[in-house]
């Protein structure tokens, strides 16, 4: 689980390849380029570098109220598991902005949460780790941050 910890790192401490991956993702999101090949060519990195890091680095922005993070969970269809997830968020003093759970198929449901991270929110990485450690959670993936 140590390789799944989250860190906030200043831009100046990041290797150039990670910054280029973020820029390539921005180009794709803004539709300035249409393919991953075009994006990687534009920022001068290999496609393999892009694929290696694309799910592991995101820009982190602050807004006036706080920070927001959107993440997705794949979880077993167990009564009370959603409540336990929400309880972990509440224990961390974070605010649920949006919540969407799919109808379970084959005993597995997907849950997407938008969370506001407030000044009084406890350590974000600890909150995510505590959610991921719950019995019945298959995985947690951060989809975006603002």
From Swiss-Prot:
Span of the signal peptide? none
Please name the taxonomic classification of the source: Bacteria, Bacillati, Bacillota, Clostridia, Lachnospirales
Show the SUPFAM superfamilies listed in the entry.
ACT-like (SSF55021)
UniProt lists the family membership as follows: Belongs to the UPF0735 family.
Q: Where is the ACT domain?
A: 70-145
Q: Which domain of life is it from?
A: Bacteria
Origin species: Lachnoclostridium phytofermentans (strain ATCC 700394 / DSM 18823 / ISDg) (Clostridium phytofermentans)
InterPro entries xrefs? ACT-like_dom_sf (IPR045865), ACT_dom (IPR002912), UPF0735_ACT_dom-cont (IPR008310)
Q: What is this protein called?
A: UPF0735 ACT domain-containing protein Cphy_3604
């Amino acid at each position: 689980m140590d390789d799944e910890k989250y860190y906030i790192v200043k831009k100046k401490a990041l290797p150039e390849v990670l910054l280029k991956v973020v820029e390539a993702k921005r180009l794709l999101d803004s539709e300035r380029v249409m393919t991953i090949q075009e994006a990687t060519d534009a920022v001068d990195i290999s496609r393999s570098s892009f694929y290696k890091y694309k799910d592991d680095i995101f820009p982190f922005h602050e807004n006036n109220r706080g920070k927001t993070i959107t993440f997705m969970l794949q979880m077993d269809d167990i009564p009370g598991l959603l409540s336990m997830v929400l309880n972990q968020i509440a224990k961390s003093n974070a605010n649920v902005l949006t919540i969407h759970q799919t109808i379970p198929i084959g005993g597995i449901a997907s849950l997407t949460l938008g969370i506001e991270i407030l000044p009084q929110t406890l350590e974000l990485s600890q909150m995510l780790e505590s959610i991921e450690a719950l019995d019945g959670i298959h995985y947690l993936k951060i989809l975006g941050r603002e």
